Amino acid sequence: MKQKILLALIAFISLVVLSSHNLFIKLKSFHLNPETEATIYLYNGTFDKSEAILARNRMKDVSLINPGEKRIHPNNSSWFEENNQTVLKFKTGKEGTGVLGVSTTSRVNNFTAESFIDNMKHEGLLQVLEDREKSEEATKPVRKKYSKHVKAIFQVGNTVSEDYKTVLGYPIELVPLNNPYDLKIGDELSMQLLIHGKPMAGEMVYASYNNQHGHAKDGSPLDAFKVLTDSGGIVKVKITTAGHWYFRTVNLIKSTENDADYISLSAAITFEITK
């Protein structure tokens, strides 16, 4: 009996931890050669380390747009697992700026009141906790339905193209408004947040690079930049260093569905600055 209780507790803790993971598409280098094999890695954990694989049956959409080509969907069987990373090999095309995207199915996690507080702190959603205090819901357990939607912008050769701004139609999506591979240190990158295809104002977007990220002792996120979207759903961030960059955000709303109390949509986009 004690062993069953312990196993159930471990499974519960694992679900809570996994729902707190950020998801990123990483490449060893986002600068690729034309007509060659390239490899992407799904990091399910932090920007530096993948702590769990992403099961292939959770991949609702996998999209690849090579420069100047139509959107294709690599088969789930093309993926394999390696060191807690989910890995995909693909072939690049001609020179230009390409896009990779992964969208997951939804999953419901059950939280105790205490574990939900930790989860919200981890995601930087403190307003949700304040609202729960005001509505006297702070001591109630929570069912959160979550999904993750991530992209990577990669550069093939030296010639840039307009493919970087392709909208994949995910429930939540970060879309660059200027090409990251046109930028140098000191330039500004504009990013638009779309939720169900519409610009979302007043949403917090985090951005950072390399190893400049983490969490404080209270669990709150520590990213290099923290910016609210304007009325057009846009944030602007000054590029301060070369390296691998990300923008990320989480949208959480009260659910009208019977199987969840909240709906969580998270988005991230990755790219590289070399100039």
Regions found by a protein language model. Give the residues of each.
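Bacterial Sec-dependent N-terminal signal peptides
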Residues: 1-22
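Beta-strand-rich domain onsets/edges
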Residues: 21-38, 119, 123-189, 194-203, ...
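Short acidic/polar inter-strand loop motif in beta-rich domains
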Residues: 49, 105-113, 253-259
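Short amphipathic beta-strand segments in non-cytosolic proteins
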Residues: 63-71, 204-226
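Glycine-centered loop-to-beta-strand initiation motif
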Residues: 84-86, 221-243
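A cross-kingdom marker for long, charged
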Residues: 234-275
